[in-house]
Amino acid sequence: MRNFSAPVNLDCELTEEQWLTLLANDPDAFNRWEAGQRLAVQAALRFIRGQHNPKTEAVLGSGYLQAMRLVLNHPDLDSAFKELVLTLPSETYISEQLESVDPQQVHAVREAMRLQLALSLQAEWQACYELNRVMGAYSPDASSSAKRALSGMALSMLCLAAVHEGTSIWPAKALQAFKDAHNMTDRFNALIALVISGHELAAQALALFHALFKNEA
């Protein structure tokens, strides 16, 4: 299907290599998004059904990671589309594809996938964060909103990778971004990046957030 955006369930008999080709190269946005979702779900289901350990084994293959690298680096894809494609399928959707659901296992596998994306694409996430930061006065236009969403995703990934590697550079940058933010979107993106990463600076950001807004209804 091409130029399609409404929810639809497709039953396509394509190989993993064909899905990877679509994800990396298809000019149609819907096909690219669908390929990414299919590949991520297939990887999660294969991992869960095989009873693998997400703490010691990789969930995502090198082909998928390389395709996502191409998406992030692509100069002609807009920020909104990149953020959409890089968003993994939800735990709810993954669970719906299983005959028997263990919520904790599904959560652990999806978190392992996020960490793998964070660690494998660190250079791309850093470039993405710097390129999509919106400086100056707040503007609610579509382009600025898309850049804020993508830079927020990049910051979350960088904080996640930093915590895993035992460094505080990106969590410290997230805290500074929280303090310097001139709008709620940027402030909340920085807060979420810290909280999701589990870094100790999240407590400081939450305390600051409470102090700033405790008197607002």
What does each of the following model-derived ranges do?
Residues 1-217:
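Long, ordered, helix-rich scaffold segments
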